[in-house]
């Protein structure tokens, strides 16, 4: 628990991503999903640049305080706290089997 409470101090960069509520439940969900897709792209880009990355959720009960600190609009859902930095060691490259491609065409 103590390690989790101080993880923000160990990363040189923390990106906070939030999604605003929509005018309908569907738009609220679409906003959240679009932000999540963008976060995945950030993580892939960070990996490409050789950075370590970690997607974490907002601490329980802290959503409104974090959103206010970030000056996000009222009602914003904190979708991710993204920790970025240079890794202490390189992760081993995992050999993957060749992709199986199926073509369906007329």
Residue ranges and their predicted role:
Residues 66-79:
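Short, electropositive alpha-helical surface patch
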Residues 26-30, 51-64:
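GST superfamily/GST-like fold recognition
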Residues 12-15, 52-53, 80:
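Structural motif
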Residues 78-106:
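C-terminal helix-cap and adjacent tail motif
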Residues 19, 57-58, 86:
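Short secondary-structure boundary segments
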Residues 1-35:
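Glycine/small-residue-rich phosphate/adenosyl-binding loop
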């Amino acid at each position: 628990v103590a390690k989790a409470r101080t993880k923000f101090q160990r990363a040189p960069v923390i990106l906070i991503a939030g999604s605003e509520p929509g005018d309908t439940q569907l738009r609220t969900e679409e906003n959240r999903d679009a932000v999540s897709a963008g976060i995945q792209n950030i993580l892939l880009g960070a990996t490409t640049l050789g950075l370590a990355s970690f997607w974490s959720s907002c601490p329980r009960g802290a959503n409104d305080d974090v959103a206010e600190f970030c000056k996000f609009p009222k009602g914003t859902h904190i979708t991710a706290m993204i920790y970025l930095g240079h890794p202490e060691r390189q992760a081993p490259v995992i050999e993957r089997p060749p992709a199986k491609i199926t073509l369906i065409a007329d």
